[in-house]
Curated annotation (Swiss-Prot):
The lineage of its organism: Bacteria, Bacillati, Bacillota, Bacilli, Bacillales. It catalyses: 2 superoxide + 2 H(+) = H2O2 + O2. InterPro entries: Mn/Fe_SOD, Mn/Fe_SOD_BS, Mn/Fe_SOD_C, Mn/Fe_SOD_N, Mn/Fe_SOD_N_sf, SOD_C_sf. Its cofactor is Mn(2+). The keyword Repressor does not apply. Belongs to the iron/manganese superoxide dismutase family. Its EC number is 1.15.1.1. This is Superoxide dismutase [Mn]. Its main location: cytoplasm. Induction: By heat shock, salt stress, oxidative stress, glucose limitation and oxygen limitation. Keywords: Cytoplasm, Manganese, Metal-binding, Oxidoreductase, Phosphoprotein, Secreted, Stress response. Homodimer. It comes from the Bacteria.
Length: 202
C-alpha cells in the first residue's frame, strides 16, 4: 500500500494574507510530495512496513531495519508532520480554543496568552529547521520542539498542534522574519481540530 499525498482541505490561496498561495503550492506539491515519494522508495518491497500507517511507522522506528531507518525517520516524519499540519490550518481559523482544551491550556500555562508566548518561543528558538509542537504526554499538555522532520510520535507523545519552522514554510513571504510568520500563524489555527485531537489523545 503506497503512501499518498493528501489533498488540502482548502484552496492554496485560502490562507492569504497570512500564508501566501505560492508558498502553500510549493510546500504541498513539492516539499510534502517529495517526502511521500522518498518514503515509498524507502519501504518498497517491505510489506510489513508498507502496510503500517505513517503514524505507526514513525511511532516505532526501532522496528524499521537499520539500513532504511534514517530515510523513514526523515521522510516518514515529513509525511506525518505535514499530513497533520494541513488539517491544523483553516481559512476560518484563529481566535481562541474553548471548552476542555481552553481550560487545560489555562491550567497548565496560566492563560492563553502565556501559552502563545511559550509556543512562539519554542518556534522562534528552534535553531535551523524543525517544528514547534503542543503535545499530549501521559495525558498532560506540554510544548516541545523537534529538529528536522522528527515527530513527537517517535517520543511517545501525541501532537495536537504543530508549526513548521523550516524556511520553506515561510521564506517567500516573510524572508528571515520568522517571528512575523509565527504571529500570522495564530490567525489560521483550526482550534476545532486541535480540540478534537486533544479529546482523542488525553
Amino acid at each position: 500500500m503506497a503512501y499518498e499525498l493528501p489533498e488540502l482541505p482548502y484552496a492554496y490561496d485560502a490562507l492569504e494574507p497570512h500564508i501566501d498561495k505560492e508558498t502553500m503550492t510549493i510546500h504541498h506539491t513539492k516539499h510534502h510530495n517529495t517526502y511521500v515519494t522518498n518514503l515509498n522508495k524507502a519501504v518498497e518491497g517491505n510489506t510489513a512496513l508498507a502496510n503500517k500507517s505513517v503514524e505507526e511507522l514513525v511511532a516505532d522506528l526501532d522496528s524499521v531495519p537499520e539500513n532504511i531507518r534514517t530515510a523513514v525517520r526523515n521522510n516518514g516524519g515529513g509525511h506525518a508532520n505535514h499530513k497533520l499540519f494541513w488539517t491544523l490550518l483553516s481559512p476560518n481559523g484563529g481566535g481562541e480554543p474553548t471548552g476542555a482544551l481552553a481550560e487545560e491550556i489555562n491550567s497548565v500555562f496560566g492563560s492563553f496568552d502565556k501559552f502563545k508566548e511559550q509556543f512562539a518561543a519554542a518556534a522562534a528558538g528552534r535553531f535551523g529547521s524543525g517544528w514547534a509542537w503542543l503535545v499530549v504526554n501521559n495525558g498532560k499538555l506540554e510544548i516541545t520542539s523537534t529538529p528536522n522532520q522528527d515527530s513527537p510520535l517517535s517520543e511517545g507523545k501525541t501532537p495536537i498542534l504543530g508549526l513548521d519552522v523550516w524556511e520553506h514554510a515561510y521564506y517567500l513571504n516573510y524572508q528571515n522574519r520568522r517571528p512575523d510568520y509565527i504571529s500570522a500563524f495564530w490567525n489560521v489555527v483550526n482550534w476545532d481540530e486541535v480540540a478534537r485531537l486533544y479529546s482523542e489523545a488525553k
